[in-house]
Amino acid sequence: MTVLVVNSGSSSLKYAVVRPASGEFLADGIIEEIGSGAVPDHDAALRAAFDELAAAGLHLEDLDLKAVGHRMVHGGKTFYKPSVVDDELIAKARELSPLAPLHNPPAIKGIEVARKLLPDLPHIAVFDTAFFHDLPAPASTYAIDRELAETWHIKRYGFHGTSHEYVSQQAAIFLDRPLESLNQIVLHLGNGASASAVAGGKAVDTSMGLTPMEGLVMGTRSGDIDPGVIMYLWRTAGMSVDDIESMLNRRSGVLGLGGASDFRKLRELIESGDEHAKLAYDVYIHRLRKYIGAYMAVLGRTDVISFTAGVGENVPPVRRDALAGLGGLGIEIDDALNSAKSDEPRLISTPDSRVTVLVVPTNEELAIARACVGVV
């Protein structure tokens, strides 16, 4: 069985051809600059992906494709497991777009294009929020007017769930321990960033909330913020709700504080003596450390902390600084292991560390492909 996985963003489209059973990738790639002259829209992007596959000798009709798997960020209360795409699903996903304005609309465009170009295959939507569907009520409930929250379905949904679930499973496999026996903290640190507490393979808390804006400081998003700031900007600075939303989503985080959302560029600015970049980094690390400590308290006993995604996997100083001085909590990392590079799961804690610290590469495309297996 082979699955085509499509992860459609506003300006890029990632694709992969995967054999779920073996984990083999026949091909993968990314089409960037959607909206430019060369790639004017998502239709052109997916056609370009097909052209790349054909150039590599992989023709769709010869691949034994059984399904097309799509990443969808927000499933709300309606979608909490992989679901066959139909017109009703698309309509409901579109209704949820205000809760994930950077993610759901381009994902819907990708799905619509793929259904048009591959009409004879089942299309499966895999939702970022699904892993957190059963969060305990104390973790998922906001302390606001209960009737208002129930009427408008306001709760913590959580995001990056496909990655958090996959990494927690891979950590257990790497350690050769039963998933059910482990209490884990997973830190998905990319341009978007989130933390989760996972007990026995089940999520018990996570940092993102109703939308992907809450929680950790991110590349362009603020993370946790006093709601009073929003009202203050609206009343005093004359900003509209749309202006504030755009600022919090696109011009905040380390970009808003330090002038760069890419950590390589941020490190260059810090090394050049840029004080704003240094503050952005310090705020990022401070927030990350707070969540690590909070989730250790939530879990009671922490067995494993795993770093994943672009920053988590590839920026050793972030891992070092996030865990520095936490020996009293049983966390000690080995500098040499932390600095080593590898594309495989690896240990970075010392033999004396009571908490095992890992770097576990995420693989959302493989996880999405495997999620399709039980549906088709």
Curated annotation (Swiss-Prot):
GO terms for biological process: acetate metabolic process; acetyl-CoA biosynthetic process. Pathway: Metabolic intermediate biosynthesis; acetyl-CoA biosynthesis; acetyl-CoA from acetate: step 1/2. Transmembrane segments: none annotated. Its EC number is 2.7.2.1. Pfam families: Acetate_kinase (PF00871). InterPro entries: Ac/propionate_kinase, Aliphatic_acid_kin_short-chain, Aliphatic_acid_kinase_CS, ATPase_NBD. Mg(2+) binds at residues 7, 364. Substrate binds at residue 71. SUPFAM superfamilies: Actin-like ATPase domain. The active site is at 128 (proton donor/acceptor). It is an enzyme of class 2 (transferase). Mg(2+). Can also accept Mn(2+). It is found in: Cytoplasm. Keywords: ATP-binding, Cytoplasm, Kinase, Magnesium, Metal-binding, Nucleotide-binding, Transferase. Its main location: cytoplasm. Signal peptide: none annotated. The record marks 160, 221 as: Transition state stabilizer. One of its GO terms (cellular component) is cytoplasm. ATP binds at residues 14, 188-192, 262-264, 310-314. The keyword Kinase applies. Homodimer. Catalyzes the formation of acetyl phosphate from acetate and ATP. Can also catalyze the reverse reaction. PANTHER family: ACETATE KINASE, ACETATE KINASE-RELATED. This is Acetate kinase. The gene is ackA.
